[in-house]
Amino acid sequence: MLRQIGVEGIVTALHDVPNGEIWALEAIQSLKDYIESHQLRWSVVESLPVSEAIKYAGPERDQLIENYKVSLANLGKAGIKTVCYNFMPVIDWIRTDLEHPWEDGTSSLYFDKIRFAYFDCMILQREGAEKDYTDLELQQVRELDKTITEAEKNELVDTIIVKTQGFVNGNIKEGDRHPVTIFRRLLSLYDGIDRDALRENLRYFLQAVMPVCDEYGINMCIHPDDPPFQVLGLPRIVTGEEDINWLLHAVDNPH
């Protein structure tokens, strides 16, 4: 079916490999061979996940970067030259609904800022969360609190911090009994880390992996923050032109 609509390349990853572990050359080659057996090509890796400890500069950062370099080298040996990654703390792309219905009968991913604010203020109960929203938005949150059901609350939690993050080897999995508690702990890892500190951690990471990219001709492609504004009190890394300009000059390398 994909070939029938003109698709030539596939964007995928080794989703079964835990975040931070090495992608074995054999596993990469096996998936590549499978894709090519259907007359397609593995064009882009999305994503080779960057571990949280790399982002917040934890004590295991250097070992995790070494693992990342080995994975990059193995991708290069398999002939895969484009790797997408992101440097968003804790939470990657955010949606409040994975199957939002539309009038024509179709459905799509959806981000509802009021429902997200409800998650932040009422469910997560993040300290100082109210400062990130307007008076009108907070009023809408209070109105939502009068009608939202427990099932809808549970689905909102599941969507924001389990289902969407599972696509990118998230830290919280299906079946975890206390996802909100785990999520709060992950957020706390970034206490005291501002935009400048996150930038320096990204620079450190890129400087470390560029020699491997040079050797194998791999291009590292960063995914912009999604959505491109501050969420949950976390620093952001690629929200607009100024961030992109910083990134292009932070590491002097074409890859």
Give the role of each language-model region.
Residues 134-255:
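Acidic/histidine-rich catalytic cores of soluble enzymes
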Residues 2, 10, 35, 75, ...:
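Conserved, mostly hydrophobic/aromatic
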Residues 68-70, 101-133, 238-252:
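Acidic, His- and aromatic-enriched active-site or binding-groove loops in soluble protein domains
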Residues 16, 48-49, 87-91, 224-230:
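Active-site-proximal loop/turn and secondary-structure-junction residues that shape catalytic pockets
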Residues 13-29:
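Glycine-rich, proline-tolerant flexible connector loops at the mouths of alpha/beta enzymes
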Residues 61, 67-93:
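Hydrophobic or amphipathic alpha-helical targeting/insertion segments
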Residues 19-22, 48-66, 91-105, 184-193:
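Surface-exposed, active-site-proximal loop segments in enzymatic domains
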